[in-house]
Amino acid sequence: MIKIGISASFFHEDPKRAIFKGMTLQYIEQNVAHWLMQRDVLSFMIPSPDGRTRREDSRITLDAYAQELDGLVLMGGSDVCPETYGEKAIRPEWNGDRVRDEYEIGLLNAFVARRKPVLGVCRGAQVINVAMGGTLWQDLGTQVPGALTHRNWEIYEKNTHATTIVPGSSLAKLYPGASLVKTNSIHHQAVKDLGRNLVAEAWSEPDRVVEAIRWTGPSYVLGVQWHPEFQPAGDRSFIDDRPILDDFLHHASLHKNAAYAL
């Protein structure tokens, strides 16, 4: 079976929290795992960002996960810290999670070094861009005139907009004949300046916010701003989530089969 690692979200130590007081919690949102599991994929959350433990240092590094797993999904979640891309937070609540940034960039680099596929979802797409030297809009609503409502807490994953797939792009090859699609939208940050060797493969309409990016380097790295794992099953009004999943897993299987052939 294909083995895919999923980056963790963090609840950092909080003395005010009633349960697990003073503890750091790491978790994944189950829809991500279920999305992968529909293709009989073994999913693993990747813990311990730097190998250190409360008991003693471990020799397990991020590269060890990249060696053993066949691909990586960078999950959505908290904001990317503006300091990670050389800025200061415009508002305190947009400080993001610098610890998670460094952990996920380390994971991305480890999997890219082994030429194993990486798929970034929402925040994950933003992490890919920042890791490659790009920048983000800290808040679309205040920084981009005429921006759509890209996040609505009241309706969450039911918030949608039209998205244009760039003609001739790798993404367009997965959706032949589909130039304008409907995607969900649950973010207030977004790609501003593209990172090194990244190309935009989809835009929101009509505000032209980057919705998908792909690395043109030697391994598979794709980031989508929407959440394919939240797509309503069987609802054909939305972009079909399966071509992206199958393309990612195809590249993971190529590396797995090559390893078995050695």
For the regions a protein language model found, what residue spans apply to each?
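N-terminal beta1-alpha1 cap of cysteine-dependent amidohydrolase-like domains
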Residues: 1-119, 130, 137, 142-175, ...
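Conserved G/P- and acidic residue-centered "switch" motifs that form tight phosphate/ATP-binding loops
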Residues: 122
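The feature captures the ABC ATPase H-loop/switch
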Residues: 125
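Active-site-proximal beta-strand elements of phosphoester/diester hydrolases
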Residues: 222-225
